[in-house]
Protein backbone atom coordinates (compact mmCIF):
# COMPACT_ATOMS: atom_id res chain seq x y z
CA UNK A 1 0.00 0.00 0.00
CA UNK A 2 1.27 3.46 -0.86
CA UNK A 3 0.58 6.57 1.15
CA UNK A 4 0.58 10.18 0.00
CA UNK A 5 0.93 13.07 2.42
CA UNK A 6 -2.10 15.33 2.03
CA UNK A 7 -2.34 17.94 4.82
CA UNK A 8 -1.36 19.09 8.29
CA UNK A 9 -4.14 19.61 10.82
CA UNK A 10 -3.47 21.80 13.81
CA UNK A 11 -5.71 22.90 16.66
CA UNK A 12 -6.28 26.62 17.13
CA UNK A 13 -7.87 28.66 19.90
CA UNK A 14 -9.63 31.19 17.66
CA UNK A 15 -10.49 30.01 14.15
CA UNK A 16 -11.24 33.45 12.69
CA UNK A 17 -8.00 34.93 14.06
CA UNK A 18 -5.94 32.04 12.68
CA UNK A 19 -7.63 32.19 9.26
CA UNK A 20 -6.85 35.92 9.11
CA UNK A 21 -3.17 35.29 9.96
CA UNK A 22 -2.61 32.67 7.27
CA UNK A 23 -4.74 34.48 4.67
CA UNK A 24 -3.64 38.08 5.23
CA UNK A 25 0.01 37.60 6.19
CA UNK A 26 0.99 34.50 4.20
CA UNK A 27 -1.38 34.83 1.24
CA UNK A 28 -3.07 31.46 1.73
CA UNK A 29 -6.41 30.87 0.05
CA UNK A 30 -9.30 29.83 2.28
CA UNK A 31 -11.17 26.78 1.06
CA UNK A 32 -14.02 24.92 2.73
CA UNK A 33 -15.05 25.80 6.28
CA UNK A 34 -17.43 23.50 8.12
CA UNK A 35 -18.95 22.81 11.50
CA UNK A 36 -18.69 19.21 12.71
CA UNK A 37 -21.63 17.94 14.76
CA UNK A 38 -19.67 14.92 16.03
CA UNK A 39 -16.99 17.07 17.69
CA UNK A 40 -18.89 20.29 18.33
CA UNK A 41 -16.04 22.03 16.53
CA UNK A 42 -15.30 23.69 13.25
CA UNK A 43 -12.51 23.45 10.69
CA UNK A 44 -11.19 25.46 7.76
CA UNK A 45 -8.91 24.37 4.94
CA UNK A 46 -6.22 26.63 3.46
CA UNK A 47 -3.63 26.29 0.69
CA UNK A 48 -1.03 28.45 -1.01
CA UNK A 49 -1.50 29.10 -4.73
CA UNK A 50 0.45 26.54 -6.74
CA UNK A 51 0.66 23.93 -3.97
CA UNK A 52 -1.31 20.74 -3.42
CA UNK A 53 -0.53 20.63 0.30
CA UNK A 54 -3.26 21.77 2.67
CA UNK A 55 -3.35 23.30 6.12
CA UNK A 56 -6.41 22.37 8.16
CA UNK A 57 -7.18 24.61 11.14
CA UNK A 58 -9.33 22.89 13.77
CA UNK A 59 -11.23 24.53 16.61
CA UNK A 60 -12.99 22.57 19.38
CA UNK A 61 -15.05 24.05 22.20
CA UNK A 62 -13.73 23.79 25.73
CA UNK A 63 -15.39 20.98 27.64
CA UNK A 64 -15.45 18.55 24.71
CA UNK A 65 -13.15 15.52 24.64
CA UNK A 66 -11.43 16.98 21.55
CA UNK A 67 -10.33 20.20 23.24
CA UNK A 68 -6.70 20.10 24.35
CA UNK A 69 -6.41 21.86 27.65
CA UNK A 70 -4.52 23.47 29.03
CA UNK A 71 -3.43 24.63 25.59
CA UNK A 72 0.32 24.33 25.08
CA UNK A 73 0.82 27.13 22.51
CA UNK A 74 1.74 24.99 19.52
CA UNK A 75 4.21 22.72 21.31
CA UNK A 76 2.70 19.64 19.65
CA UNK A 77 3.55 20.95 16.19
CA UNK A 78 7.15 22.01 15.54
CA UNK A 79 6.77 24.33 12.55
CA UNK A 80 5.24 24.89 9.13
CA UNK A 81 7.60 25.74 6.26
CA UNK A 82 6.95 28.13 3.38
CA UNK A 83 9.30 28.70 0.44
CA UNK A 84 9.63 32.31 -0.66
CA UNK A 85 11.85 34.40 -2.94
CA UNK A 86 13.60 36.33 -0.14
CA UNK A 87 13.44 35.16 3.48
CA UNK A 88 14.84 38.47 4.76
CA UNK A 89 12.20 40.55 2.99
CA UNK A 90 9.44 38.10 3.92
CA UNK A 91 10.44 38.25 7.60
CA UNK A 92 10.43 42.07 7.60
CA UNK A 93 7.07 42.17 5.80
CA UNK A 94 5.33 39.70 8.10
CA UNK A 95 6.65 41.33 11.29
CA UNK A 96 5.53 44.73 9.95
CA UNK A 97 2.07 43.23 9.37
CA UNK A 98 1.87 42.02 12.97
CA UNK A 99 3.45 38.56 13.05
CA UNK A 100 5.40 37.84 16.21
CA UNK A 101 9.16 37.55 15.51
CA UNK A 102 10.63 34.08 16.02
CA UNK A 103 14.21 34.04 14.70
CA UNK A 104 15.63 36.77 12.47
CA UNK A 105 17.06 35.69 9.11
CA UNK A 106 20.16 33.47 9.09
CA UNK A 107 22.00 31.26 6.62
CA UNK A 108 22.08 27.49 7.01
CA UNK A 109 23.98 25.60 4.33
CA UNK A 110 22.44 26.72 1.01
CA UNK A 111 19.26 28.18 2.55
CA UNK A 112 18.34 31.52 4.03
CA UNK A 113 15.86 30.95 6.88
CA UNK A 114 13.77 33.10 9.20
CA UNK A 115 10.91 32.34 11.57
CA UNK A 116 7.77 34.14 12.70
CA UNK A 117 5.17 32.80 15.13
CA UNK A 118 1.45 32.46 14.43
CA UNK A 119 -1.28 33.51 16.91
CA UNK A 120 -1.31 30.05 18.53
CA UNK A 121 2.46 29.76 19.02
CA UNK A 122 3.25 27.66 15.94
CA UNK A 123 6.56 28.63 14.32
CA UNK A 124 6.43 29.54 10.62
CA UNK A 125 9.64 28.93 8.64
CA UNK A 126 10.40 31.26 5.74
CA UNK A 127 12.94 29.68 3.39
CA UNK A 128 14.77 30.98 0.33
CA UNK A 129 18.05 30.16 -1.41
CA UNK A 130 21.09 31.69 0.28
CA UNK A 131 22.58 34.62 -1.61
Label each residue range with its predicted role:
Residues 9-54, 96:
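Core segments of cupin and vicinal oxygen chelate
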Residues 1, 31, 42-45, 82, ...:
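Vicinal oxygen chelate
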Residues 1-17, 77-82, 127-131:
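N-terminal beta-strand motif that seeds the catalytic metal site of vicinal oxygen chelate
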Residues 71-75:
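Short glycine/proline- and charge-enriched loop/turn segments
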Residues 59-64, 128-131:
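Acetyl-CoA-dependent GNAT
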Residues 50-54, 62-64, 87-88:
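Short, charged/polar surface micro-motifs in flexible loops or helix N-caps
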Residues 32, 66-70:
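Short, P/G- and charge-enriched loop/turn segments at secondary-structure junctions
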Residues 21, 88-93:
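Short amphipathic alpha-helices within nucleic acid-binding modules
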